[in-house]
Amino acid sequence: MKNPIITITMENGGVIKAELYPEIAPNTVNNFIDLVNRGFYDGLIFHRVIPGFMIQGGCPEGTGMGGPGYSIKGEFTSNGFKNDLKHTKGVLSMARAMHPDSAGSQFFIMVADAPHLDGQYASFGKVIEGMEVADKIVAQKTDMYDRPYEDQVIKSVTVDLQGYEAKEPEIIED
């Protein structure tokens, strides 16, 4: 079976395509697909961009403090879940607070390798096309909070399931 493919279309026309890995982080993938299908990410920004590290988006408030109103269990090794997908350039992973089960909608795309994140965050996909778009986003001038002065707006995120049957995500109510 083929893996689902997401397409992130930026307001400026840039396109990032990524393959999701349900065999590595099934609930994380199901949650992401559910949010995509609800149009959750449409119009949001990459609010945190750090050269040599990653770009982060998926916060409805654009501050890094927001989420979907619930969280999901962290599917990563230090949280008792086997996940061997390394945080190398192009990998998608879920942002979270200190608590291991605090991820919701915020995600990041690695623009460089960050082995210190391996086993600590739920990696769940990888860019297969348009990595140069992420590289352009991370090169934007930012304020002291790593937020680009010019909003990097996600126009839409869509998913091609390619035969994958997404299930209702298991959530933890806030």
Q: What label would you give each PLM region?
A:
Residues M1-D174:
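Cyclophilin-like peptidyl-prolyl cis-trans isomerases
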